[in-house]
């Protein structure tokens, strides 16, 4: 029997340093193993809405996370807080607030790094993991490409500018 898909709730939590964090909760009464979706470096929780809707319709609860400074989470004026340890603490606070003691994780890029770190630091928490756009070895050329554009993107005034910017950021991956 297929479950009734639920609309997501926008939830907020105060981080250890007082910053307001946002995440999406696609509830599903009676779900046993929640799925936690962790996005890439510059991406929001909304990236997972289609996946969350499908999983939710199958009876799974889904939590999708906005890291600090992304999506609807508050921007942090201290740039040193944009690091894996601080973000991992943020993720754990959300899971604690939601009563999640074990989950399946879907991690894209930086979210995959968080998933692997959580599996190392909290093996009791990670029951299953799906890693997207990341693996145990990180290609240096890819990191250099990302560094070229993160935090440096100009305003986009036209579709021509958007295409040029996509070619620049994606390199040879954009035909």
Model-derived segments and their meaning:
Residues 49, 92, 116-120:
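Short, hydrophobic alpha-helix immediately C-terminal to the catalytic nucleophile
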Residues 16, 57, 67-106:
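Active-site loop/oxyanion-hole signature of alpha/beta-hydrolase fold enzymes
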Residues 148-157:
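Acceptor-substrate binding/catalytic loop of class I
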Residues 157-175:
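Conserved alpha/beta-hydrolase catalytic His-Asp/Glu region
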């Amino acid at each position: 029997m297929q479950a009734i898909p639920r609309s997501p709730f926008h939830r907020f939590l105060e981080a250890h340093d007082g910053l307001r964090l946002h995440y999406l909760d696609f509830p599903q009464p009676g779900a046993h193993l929640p799925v936690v979706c962790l996005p890439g470096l510059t991406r929001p929780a909304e990236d997972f809405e289609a996946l969350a809707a499908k999983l939710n319709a199958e009876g799974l609860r889904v939590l999708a996370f906005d890291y600090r400074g992304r999506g609807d989470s508050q921007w942090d004026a201290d740039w040193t807080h944009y690091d894996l340890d601080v973000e991992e603490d943020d993720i754990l606070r959300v899971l604690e607030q939601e009563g999640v003691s074990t989950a399946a994780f879907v991690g894209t890029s930086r979210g995959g790094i968080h998933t692997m770190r959580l599996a190392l630091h909290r093996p009791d928490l990670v029951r299953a993991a799906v890693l997207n756009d990341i693996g145990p070895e990180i290609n240096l050329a890819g990191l250099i490409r990302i560094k070229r554009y993160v935090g440096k993107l100009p305003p986009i005034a036209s579709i021509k500018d958007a295409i040029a910017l996509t070619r620049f950021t994606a390199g040879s991956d954009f035909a």
